[in-house]
């Protein structure tokens, strides 16, 4: 595992070559993303200059980018859609790309990721069904939780669906799984979940959201809470109820995608949690208490 680490160290000075030119530069292993808000030709020129500087940086280190794998994604309805080049070659434009295991689209809607996750999970579930003809509830549920459900829940804080169709696309996989279990009395999905002690996938996504909010606000990990949330008490229009130092403020958004973005969709649910639970220090204790709270409602 030393090779990947040495490679990351080797490319760590890429930022120096494009410093001051971009709004966004993100690296993960050998994947690099450059981003810039482009509304005029000057913005386009800055982004193109960053691409040119990146190519010069690679040449200095005796490397070259695989231009055939480099893509441009134009986001926003008013995006002018300029053409960009690397090493004299025009970059291909794409509306959909996989980024660290998640399908990202130009519209930023999660439908493509939901479809991919459901398809992968269905394939694994089918393999389990063929391998186990008698599906004892204890054994089969352990297999489902370990091999199927993770595909439906990977990084959902980044792409949690909000439309009924996308939610159903994921939930149908779990519904199929519980119908495979032998010995259950009811044919009703919700009653089968109750017999098996399983929550819906939507409920698990909600609890995962709250757990992530707690981690960010407690300063765990690399995310800066001030970049994600605004404290309601800091607002100039704070009321007596919103002045609770634990409460967050919803940032106004005109578009549906903005209203359902993680930092907005979690606010009301977070503010509804009793203060004594939100003040819990350890993440695992918070998750346990919040799970109990949801079960009691």
Summary of predicted features, one role per range:
Residues 4-35:
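Active-site palm subdomain of RNA-directed nucleic acid polymerases
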Residues 32-56, 161:
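Catalytic palm subdomain of template-directed nucleic-acid polymerases
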Residues 89-157:
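Basic, alpha-helical interaction scaffolds
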Residues 25, 44-47, 51, 65, ...:
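Hydrophobic packing residues in well-ordered alpha-helices of helical domains and bundles
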Residues 164-297:
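Short linear motifs embedded in intrinsically disordered, charge-biased segments
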Residues 1-6, 35-40, 93, 105-107, ...:
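Short, conserved non-catalytic motifs in the polymerase core
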Residues 63-97:
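Short, conserved micro-motifs composed of acidic
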Residues 3, 14, 30-32, 54, ...:
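Mobile genetic element proteins and their domesticated derivatives, centered on retroelements
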């Amino acid at each position: 595992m030393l090779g990947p680490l040495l490679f990351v160290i080797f490319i760590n000075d890429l930022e120096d070559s494009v410093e001051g030119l971009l709004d966004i530069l993100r690296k993960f292993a050998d994947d690099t993303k450059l981003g810039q808000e482009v509304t005029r030709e000057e913005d386009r020129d800055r982004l193109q200059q960053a691409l040119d500087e990146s190519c010069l940086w690679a040449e200095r280190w005796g490397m070259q980018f695989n231009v055939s794998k480099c893509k441009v994604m134009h986001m926003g309805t008013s995006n002018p859609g300029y053409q960009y080049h690397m090493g004299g070659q025009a970059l291909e434009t794409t509306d959909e790309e996989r980024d660290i295991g998640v399908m990202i689209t130009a519209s930023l809607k999660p439908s493509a990721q939901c479809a991919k996750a459901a398809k992968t999970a269905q394939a694994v579930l089918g393999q389990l069904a063929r391998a186990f003809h008698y599906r004892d509830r204890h054994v089969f549920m352990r297999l489902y939780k370990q091999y199927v459900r993770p595909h439906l829940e990977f990084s959902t804080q980044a792409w949690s669906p909000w439309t009924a169709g996308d939610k159903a696309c994921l939930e149908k996989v779990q519904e199929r799984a519980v119908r495979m279990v032998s010995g259950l009395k009811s044919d009703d999905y919700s009653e089968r979940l109750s017999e098996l002690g399983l929550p819906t996938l939507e409920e698990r996504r909600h609890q995962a959201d709250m757990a992530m909010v707690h981690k960010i606000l407690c300063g765990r990990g690399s995310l800066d809470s001030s970049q994600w949330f605004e404290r309601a008490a800091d607002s100039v229009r704070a009321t007596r109820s919103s002045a609770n130092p634990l409460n967050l403020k919803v940032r106004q958004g005109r578009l549906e995608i903005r209203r359902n973005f993680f930092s907005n969709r979690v606010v009301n649910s977070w503010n509804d949690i009793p203060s004594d639970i939100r003040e819990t220090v350890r993440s695992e204790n918070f998750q346990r208490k919040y799970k109990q709270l949801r079960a009691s409602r």
